């Protein structure tokens, strides 16, 4: 560990000498980029070394459209391709994500022996970039398909019903290369500057939708919700320890953001609070998870007919679109 720290400091000193040396280098501008500015040595950041700091965030809708235009210049597009509409549906995408999106769409078009990209190609590549490649060759049993269909339908219903987290873009029971048995992909419709307590609670509720659907339908539960539970727990913990969203804990930051393992940093993690506070934090996290679990159970139980209809459609088609999913609710309202 001392050796790692020594090498890290050596690199810092070397860069400092290279930047200002023992004389003056006229006409030389030093530029650098990092996504971890918080761990940089202050000596590197002092005036005279890096005088101007520019934060480059994720592009907004206008920026995404301009980036798409750049990457579309060398790709023939069909008449139905609308770059503005694509920009609207790719909130949160980076420039690299958008480039990858069009590259994947071009591959889809080439595989279908087409000389140009159509909107359907982009829809397919959107899922691949957002979720990962589908592995249609993987064989799963009918029982596993049914469990997965109920699991994903549970997520989808909550995405649709809860006002701040939807709508659904695609629901699938086709396994992915990342190891998931299926996926439910939401469609962000606008850029968000910040999150709210209400929306975060809805996100946790959606995370628990798959497990709730399994509990309501089957006599047993599966390991398929492990990642969902991990996400829900992390979000609940952030609400309690980082964002001051727990009345019991109060407006105090207990998050250990500076304890991440990094080259040159101590590997030992320390906690800035005692066991009593730790117990309160755990209790608050459990309370949030339990309340969201009950909310998910209430909503899915009230939409049991849509749950069953969605499962039936998924078992028939394996993947359904937003329009097909929303039609299930429209048919329900007509009963």
Q: Where are the model-predicted features located?
A:
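Short pre-active-site segment immediately N-terminal to the catalytic Zn-binding motif
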Residues: 136-147, 192
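Short regulatory helix/loop adjacent to the ATP-binding pocket of P-loop NTPases
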Residues: 37-49
């Amino acid at each position: 560990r001392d050796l790692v720290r020594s090498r890290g400091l050596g690199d810092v000193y070397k860069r400092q000498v290279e930047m200002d040396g023992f004389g003056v280098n006229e006409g030389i501008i030093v530029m650098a980029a990092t996504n971890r500015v918080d761990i940089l040595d202050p000596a590197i950041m002092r005036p005279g070394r890096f005088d101007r700091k520019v934060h480059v965030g994720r592009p907004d809708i206008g920026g995404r459209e301009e980036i798409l235009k750049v990457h579309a210049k060398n790709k023939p597009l069909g008449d139905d391709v609308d770059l503005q509409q694509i920009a609207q549906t790719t909130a949160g995408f980076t420039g690299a994500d958008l480039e990858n999106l069009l590259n994947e769409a071009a591959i889809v078009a080439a595989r279908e022996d087409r000389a140009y990209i159509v909107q359907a190609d982009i829809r397919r590549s959107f899922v691949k970039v957002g979720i990962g490649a589908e592995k249609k060759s993987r064989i799963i049993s009918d029982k596993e398909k049914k469990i997965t269909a109920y699991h994903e339908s549970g997520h989808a219903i909550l995405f649709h019903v809860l006002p701040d987290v939807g709508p659904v873009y695609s629901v699938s029971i086709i396994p992915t290369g990342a190891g998931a048995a299926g996926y439910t992909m939401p469609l962000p419709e606008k850029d968000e500057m910040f999150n709210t307590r209400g929306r975060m609670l809805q996100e946790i509720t959606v995370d628990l939708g798959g497990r709730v659907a399994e509990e309501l339908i089957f006599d047993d539960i599966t390991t398929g919700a492990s990642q969902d539970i991990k996400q829900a727990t992390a979000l609940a913990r952030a609400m309690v320890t980082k964002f001051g969203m727990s009345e019991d804990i109060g407006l105090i930051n207990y998050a250990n953001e500076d304890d991440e393992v990094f080259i040159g940093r101590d590997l030992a993690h320390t906690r800035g609070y005692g066991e009593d506070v730790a117990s309160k934090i755990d209790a608050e996290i459990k309370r949030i998870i339990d309340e969201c679990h009950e909310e998910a159970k209430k909503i899915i139980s009230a939409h049991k007919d849509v749950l069953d209809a969605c499962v039936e459609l998924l078992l028939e088609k394996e993947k359904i679109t937003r329009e097909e999913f929303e039609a299930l609710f429209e048919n329900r309202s007509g009963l």
